[in-house]
């Protein structure tokens, strides 16, 4: 692809919005449970002791999304070492280089799907620990969102060109 045939797009996901949705889903899942101790465990996803797990899975979900957008998001390795320090970022940014013919609506759809994927990934992990009977529902949603992301990428690579002769 020539340089002028590409456009750079940054997908930005504010951590505060991701956390709001994650906490909201955890609250709803906990609220519909019968009154018992587990109800509060499910709803307390952002408590001090639990936030480390949330950050780790959110960072993993971000990395998975960057990988799903390959070849548009490929980054060369820029360091020879990587630590596992937990860091909650202000926002998660995915830089992608898309072909000029890539649809703006596809970019909008991808942005929404990636946001949902990151949220669902954290909620599914949290429920696998605290409410295993609901975790399967979130895993199904997660697989569905992942398929939609891949489908959006595959279907929007450019305009269809039909040859005049079939053979």
Spell out what each predicted region is.
Residues 125, 130-131, 146-147:
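Mixed-charge, glycine-accented linear interaction segment located at domain edges/termini
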Residues 1-107, 141-143, 147-167:
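Conserved short "hinge" loops at termini or chain/domain junctions
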Residues 60-63, 116-128:
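Short, hydrophobic/amphipathic alpha-helical patches that form generic packing surfaces
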Residues 107-116:
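Structural motif
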């Amino acid at each position: 692809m020539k340089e002028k045939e590409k456009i750079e797009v940054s997908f930005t996901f504010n951590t505060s919005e991701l956390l709001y949705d994650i906490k909201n889903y955890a609250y709803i899942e906990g609220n519909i449970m019968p009154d018992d101790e587990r109800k509060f465990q499910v709803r307390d996803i952002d408590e001090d002791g639990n936030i480390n797990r949330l950050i780790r899975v959110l960072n993993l979900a971000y990395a998975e999304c960057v990988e799903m957008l390959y070849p548009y998001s490929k980054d060369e390795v820029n360091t020879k070492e990587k630590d596992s320090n937990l860091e909650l970022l202000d926002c998660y940014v995915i830089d992608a280089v898309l072909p000029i013919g890539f649809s703006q609506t596809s970019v909008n759809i991808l942005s929404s799907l990636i946001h949902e994927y990151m949220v669902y990934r954290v909620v599914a992990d949290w429920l696998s620990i605290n409410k295993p009977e609901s975790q399967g529902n979130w895993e199904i949603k997660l697989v569905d969102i992942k398929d939609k992301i891949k489908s959006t990428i595959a279907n929007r690579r450019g305009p269809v060109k039909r040859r005049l002769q079939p053979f």
